[in-house]
Amino acid sequence: MTPLHRIEERLHSLTVRQAIGLVVGANLFLVALAFALPADGEMRGPALLSVLGNFHILALHIPAAVLLVVPLFEFFERHEQATATVRRLSVFSAAGTWGAVLCGIVHAHYNGFSGEGIQLHLWGGIAASAFAGIASLLLSQGFLLRLVGQLVAIGVMGFAAHVGGELQHGEGFPFKPNKKIVADSN
């Protein structure tokens, strides 16, 4: 039996109450960590945790992409019960989003980030993790409810991603031209 099958069996054996507890507990841990490691602008690196925080940039793209793909599988397969593919991708995206947020909290705390935009991105990311977890909890529900849960998770993740993109690439991202293209046209 592969490790993926073992994980899936363990998750499938959870009661509804245990599954809700897992999602709520994991995301409350992120909330507590956000308060314990504030993004207050103080440089604390380079340290091992500072380097770990840098993985936020790497860790966020794969779960976000998978979260975007899950509703496509749902829509085109159209089963009343979630297929194994949908279950696995949904759980992977929820766990990956949680990991990306964890790395982001560490990244902001140890690398001197602060400000309103960082706070908006932080809490948007925590909300994205929570809604990705909720979408995974809805896997036992009917097609329409699962699809709505996944689309809400994508919307919240899109908001957090937009704020993060603006922090990195400037206001108006992604709906403005690349700086190089603008410079070349002048």
Predicted regions mapped to residue ranges:
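Polytopic transmembrane helical bundles with strong interfacial aromatic enrichment
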Residues: 2-186
